Amino acid sequence: MGKPMQVSRYWRHFREKYRLIGGKCENGHLLFPKRPICPICGSRNIEEFQFSGKGKVITWTIVRNPPSGFEYYKPYPLALVQLEEGPVVLAQLTDVEPEEIKEGMEVEMVTRKIREFDEDGLILYGYKFRPIIKSE
């Protein structure tokens, strides 16, 4: 099994993982994750931008042979989610059965356990997406 991410590095990325903090360049291009240079226009003037956490499933698959450390979760759905604001995020889907997943399904970001390291007890949390349940 690979070594866990250093705790200090994990905490540096805390806001991105829990609140979907990305970037917005001076020309209005939205980026996730935040980058030092806008890949669209080359601007270096990037400010923080908080995404709503809502979006739609573009496409998805079921991971049946996961990477080391994620065997406990198999099989699990992995999706490309287009956020309301435009950027596309690759993330696990949660709180949904595979037969219920549809392209265009509205989802929202939630914080969930991503991985647990038995050797030192470190638990990593991050974002996943779940279906938005519409009340009638």
UniProtKB/Swiss-Prot annotation:
Q: Which GO terms describe its molecular function?
A: metal ion binding
Q: Does the keyword Hydrolase apply?
A: no
Keyword Metal-binding in record? yes
User: Which family is this sequence assigned to?
Assistant: Belongs to the scaffold protein DUF35 family.
Q: How does it assemble?
A: Interacts with acetoacetyl-CoA thiolase and HMG-CoA synthase (HMGCS) that catalyzes the first and second step in the mevalonate pathway, respectively.
The job of this chain, per UniProt, is described as: Functions as a scaffold to connect the acetoacetyl-CoA thiolase and HMG-CoA synthase (HMGCS) dimers in the channeling thiolase/HMGCS complex, which allows for efficient coupling of the endergonic thiolase reaction with the exergonic HMGCS reaction.
Name used for this protein in its record: DUF35 domain-containing scaffold protein
Organism, as annotated = Pyrococcus furiosus (strain ATCC 43587 / DSM 3638 / JCM 8422 / Vc1)
What is the gene name? Answer: acaC
